[in-house]
Amino acid sequence: MSNNEDPINEFVSNGDSFEKVKQRLKDRSKKVAQTKEILSKQANQTKEILSKQAVKIAKQAEEHESFINKVTHLLGVLGFGGFCFLLGARPQDIPYVYCLFFFIFVPLRWIYYRFKKWHYFLLDFCYYANTIFLVDLLLYPKDEKLFMVCFSFAEGPLAWALIVWRCSLVFSSVDKIVSVLIHLLPGLVFFTIRWWNPATFEAMHPEGTSGRASWPYVEDKSFLFTWLFLVPLVAYFLWQLLYFLIVNVLRRQRLLRDPEVMTSYRELSKKAQKANNVWWRLSGLLGDQNRMLMYILLQALFTVATTALTVPIFLSYELHAVFQILKVSAAVWNGGSFLLDVMPRQVILKEKKKSELQPAHIQQYHSEPKQDQSPNSMEIRMKTIHSAEEQ
């Protein structure tokens, strides 16, 4: 009898232990859910606090906008002058200046763009290419093939984007300075490494040889074509695929929910539609529903064409030097156009908005005609008052 009861007792005890384990799992899941809820609340509170602080800082910056612009202009001019001096005095240090610039200003730009809902701009090709530049300069500075790929990016799509998209060198705007330097600095870096770096000179003029070598060493035309044209295009199409998957597939619903979030396509199509220019007409060749596809095709054609132009630039020092002057001149010219044509209109619009936001009674006070304060008018008023008192 006892033998028969043992399995029953064991079964009951096992059942009790199973219930206990089940209860423990429920308790743990409740605790996890509570912890998640607490963390989400804390995250939302932190986000609200940060957004309030950001709005407060933005308002304070707007109040002192004139002073901030003057300080930015001063520092921008001094920094650009110092960079030009360093470019002539110690060209071998220019890559380190570029790396320092990238590690300081790109994270700051992400914070600023995140607040403005522009952070998807940091998925653009220029940031992808700049990341590859950092890998080359910091990890593989003597890799000739990677250098040629980076050279093709820097003096191809990035350099011509500076000209075609009219990036403006405006020293009073940190955002515009950073936009220009992201496209301009890489080309200057690889120009100095290619032609002005003392280490490159040693490789080009090795001791004990009468002939002139080159760095990077180009074996034949097929080698040049492969590493200056084909491989960069493969890397570009890889970026295009990743960009499409992230923006148009993975984050599609997020972008549809919030039309204020900007991407490069949204920004360019918005400007092109407003101006009704050639880009807007070209992007509509396949219909409005296929504008995104046309934008990708046009960008691919632009990349292929500008990448092909890097081959003669790579082979000629004179042509490469002239191209540097062309890029800087275009950025300065666009900056002058912005200061003389665009900025005055922006100032007028800001003043108009400020006047519209003023209280109605202040506007009424300013709109009322002022009374004549001349001595004759004052005398007439005094006589009128006295005569009224006598009556």
Curated annotation (Swiss-Prot):
This is Glycerophosphocholine acyltransferase 1. It catalyses: sn-glycerol 3-phosphocholine + an acyl-CoA = a monoacyl-sn-glycero-3-phosphocholine + CoA; sn-glycero-3-phosphoethanolamine + an acyl-CoA = a monoacyl-sn-glycero-3-phosphoethanolamine + CoA; sn-glycerol 3-phosphocholine + hexadecanoyl-CoA = hexadecanoyl-sn-glycero-3-phosphocholine + CoA; (9Z)-hexadecenoyl-CoA + sn-glycerol 3-phosphocholine = (9Z-hexadecenoyl)-sn-glycero-3-phosphocholine + CoA. Glycerophosphocholine acyltransferase (GPCAT) that utilizes acyl-CoA to acylate glycero-3-phosphocholine (GPC), forming lysophosphatidylcholine (LPC). Shows broad acyl specificities with a preference for 16:0-CoA, polyunsaturated acyl-CoA, and the hydroxylated ricinoleoyl-CoA. Also catalyzes the acylation of glycero-3-phosphoethanolamine (GPE) with acyl-CoA. In addition to acyl-CoA, GPCAT efficiently utilizes LPC and lysophosphatidylethanolamine (LPE) as acyl donors in the acylation of GPC. GO terms for biological process: phosphatidylcholine biosynthetic process. It is an enzyme of class 2 (transferase). Residues 380-391 have a biased composition (Basic and acidic residues). PANTHER family: GLYCEROPHOSPHOCHOLINE ACYLTRANSFERASE 1, OS01G0585100 PROTEIN. GO terms for molecular function: acyltransferase activity. Keywords: Acyltransferase, Lipid biosynthesis, Lipid metabolism, Membrane, Phospholipid biosynthesis, Phospholipid metabolism, Transferase, Transmembrane, Transmembrane helix. Residues 88-92, 141-144, 194-226, 316-318 are lumenal.
